[in-house]
Amino acid sequence: MANFNVPKLGVFPVAAVFDIDNVPEDSSATGSRWLPSIYQGGNYWGGGPQALHAQVSNFDSSNRLPYNPRTENNPAGNCAFAFNPFGQYISNISSAQSVHRRIYGIDLNDEPLFSPNAASITNGGNPTMSQDTGYHNIGPINTAYKAEIFRPVNPLPMSDTAPDPETLEPGQTEPLIKSDGVYSNSGIASFIFDRPVTEPNPNWPPLPPPVIPIIYPTPALGIGAAAAYGFGYQVTVYRWEEIPVEFIADPETCPAQPTTDKVIIRTTDLNPEGSPCAYEAGIILVRQTSNPMNAVAGRLVPYVEDIAVDIFLTGKFFTLNPPLRITNNYFADDEVKENTVTIGNYTTTLSSAYYAVYKTDGYGGATCFIASGGAGISALVQLQDNSVLDVLYYSLPLSLGGSKAAIDEWVANNCGLFPMSGGLDKTTLLEIPRRQLEAINPQDGPGQYDLFILDDSGAYASFSSFIGYPEAAYYVAGAATFMDVENPDEIIFILRNGAGWYACEIGDALKIADDEFDSVDYFAYRGGVMFIGSARYTEGGDPLPIKYRAIIPGLPRGRLPRVVLEYQAVGMSFIPCQTHCLGKGGIISKV
């Protein structure tokens, strides 16, 4: 399996990502397991790293690797953790303080490296979920670049201590943890700087070597000076390659030597489940169903790929939030009643939560669901057509004051589903056609729950004004976006500016004719990349055009493309940020 160091200061990391679309799921009590990988930062609804420990234990042991806490007899435990490209350790590991000091020489009593209340900027000014717990966590806006982990049965514990080689399980030849560093299979967590780029925090870890990052200024655009920061890193992608399985009945002996081209399983009357003969340790055996003769095998083959990312920064903060993948195989088709929310492989409990599976893939995996609770609402959304945006999810915390109109709209726009009852009843969902969208006939005086007919089929979508940011000197007038999944280069924008609705394609000039509403919010999908932009018109009068486009190289699946956002505007403030904040800019790209 892949090993990589949690980086020391100034060391750029190498992550491991597993391309596991074709990896079979193991439904038996033997075979492989998904390793719980806690990639959310310290304070994402859970109250800090320590609180995450209790939540990890909620994994279904029949489908997940059980969480083994650190004990006197098991000092290592099974602790998965995450890190970010600049070396800041944001862990759920129980020895977080000592590891902080040992690896980074950081005194936890010093000024935090990251803003403990950064989330309040994008959570409508509500810092409820962003209190600092002493672990330099970054609040609830740290959705991470999720690495899918596929492990053999009985994996070694993840720890900052080297395991005794004598404790290795049969067939395991190399420990995942070494004494000269901490190894993880977790991926890259997102990060937020709490100072403007012109005032670097002396406590920040040094930037990577100059050959990797490129820092170049851009002109000031209305509110504060903006800059763009580009960097790159390598990702080891493990792809599943299947190996034939041969069943033999009542053999006298197994082959003398392990084989690398197939797995031999011998079955007897006393053991119809069968037991595999010795084979190469790198082969993973998966028993898919209760039928003992239904088993597959394969290996994960590594490929190193380069990733390049451009980040646009401005003013107070910036963050990188690449997409994550949800692999839960225990989502039921029916509404889930428990007061828990699972995001990726992370489970937590909300103070007052409800969520429903809006759509499943037919195998128990959710393709679209929402969760809400407390002062924030999170929607994890996947577009229907994986061939367009792959498995693009993103989280959208909102302060809605009890209104779920924006969530309804998000589900409608991004999932092609709309709960006609206005509630979380999946039985009332209607499919929204993604073609013939030009036939929108808005009603007079649109409101949050007004329905707009899309075509003659009777399907509906809801539109609403999303959320206001008066403290940021601009607000969102409201928008919605649809995409033709068969032709992703043709995107239709539906913009409300007080005078009516407008539809146009990407690259066209967007105009506002009514100076009563001086801002516009829009989404755009193109070539598998979504970016959110917001513009404020600083003076009324003639309409001011906005031109923008995303240049997305045609990279294969498994690559994070280099994204260059070109923009040209007059009297416009372009405020890029992470994907969570509606009304501000940002980009996310597919894995």
UniProtKB/Swiss-Prot annotation:
InterPro entries given in the database record: P2_sf (IPR036325), Phage_PRD1_P2 (IPR015297), Phage_PRD1_P2_C (IPR015948), Phage_PRD1_P2_N (IPR015949)
TM region positions: none
Keyword Disulfide bond annotated: yes
Disulfide bonds: C254-C277
Disulfide bond listed as a keyword: yes
Source species, domain of life: Viruses
Gene Ontology cellular component list: virion component
Keywords: Disulfide bond, Host-virus interaction, Viral attachment to host cell, Virion, Virus entry into host cell
Secretion signal, residue range per the UniProt entry: none
Subcellular location: Virion
Gene Ontology biological-process annotations: symbiont entry into host cell; virion attachment to host cell
Purpose: Adsorption protein. In association with P31 and trimeric P5, forms the spike complexes located at the 5-fold vertices of the capsid. Involved in recognition and attachment to the receptor on the surface of the host. Likely triggers the processes of vertex disassembly, membrane tube formation, and subsequent DNA injection. Essential for viral infectivity.
Protein name: Adsorption protein P2
